[in-house]
Curated annotation (Swiss-Prot):
SUPFAM superfamilies: dUTPase-like (SSF51283). It comes from Bradyrhizobium sp. (strain ORS 278). It catalyses: dUTP + H2O = dUMP + diphosphate + H(+). This enzyme is involved in nucleotide metabolism: it produces dUMP, the immediate precursor of thymidine nucleotides and it decreases the intracellular concentration of dUTP so that uracil cannot be incorporated into DNA. It is an enzyme of class 3 (hydrolase). The keyword Hydrolase applies. Pathway: Pyrimidine metabolism; dUMP biosynthesis; dUMP from dCTP (dUTP route): step 2/2. Substrate binds at residues 72-74, 85, 89-91. Its EC number is 3.6.1.23. HAMAP family: dUTPase_bact. This is Deoxyuridine 5'-triphosphate nucleotidohydrolase. Belongs to the dUTPase family. GO terms for biological process: dUMP biosynthetic process; dUTP catabolic process.
Length: 152
């Protein structure tokens, strides 16, 4: 069963008039984030370039939760545009604007218009770890095998 939590959202002046992030299907894990760029000033991402794109909102996550900013698969597949620091993490104590760091890995310039769906935001529970220093670790079949060690 899906858990639902309440999140306070503040709409910033440049986000006025844009819809709130929304889930596009009944079982979607992420809600789409929209670009809050000025209508007369779209952001053009040249191939190989990146830009911080505003969403026009800030959020107050409940303690024990984070928001992950992830790429939209369609933008990546069709245009090579993705979230550079994927997943971007928004901590529960952050109150600044939610922004999306996009990069264009494609071969053509990509224009981001106001209201365009640019990323998705997934709300997740946070588990904190307590680290314990030791001189040995338990044995596993994999051992210290790293990159590529489990085959192709």
């Amino acid at each position: 069963m899906t858990q639902t939590i309440a999140i306070d959202v503040r709409i910033l002046p440049h986000g006025a008039g844009l819809p709130l992030p929304a889930y596009q299907t009944a079982h979607a894990a992420g809600m789409d984030l929209l670009a809050a760029v000025a209508p007369d000033a779209p952001v053009v991402l040249a191939p190989g370039s990146h830009a911080m794109v505003p969403t026009g909102l800030s959020i107050a996550l409940p303690d024990g939760f984070e928001a992950q900013v992830r790429p939209r698969s369609g933008l990546a597949a069709r245009h090579g545009v993705t979230v550079l620091n994927s997943p971007g993490t928004i901590d529960a104590d952050y109150r600044g604007e939610v922004c999306v760091l996009l990069i264009n890995h494609g071969k053509e310039p990509f224009t981001i218009q106001r209201g365009e769906r640019i990323a998705q935001m997934v709300i997740a529970s946070v588990v904190r770890a307590e680290l314990a220093i030791t001189t040995t670790l338990s044995e596993t079949a994999r051992g210290s095998g790293g990159f590529g060690s489990t085959g192709r």
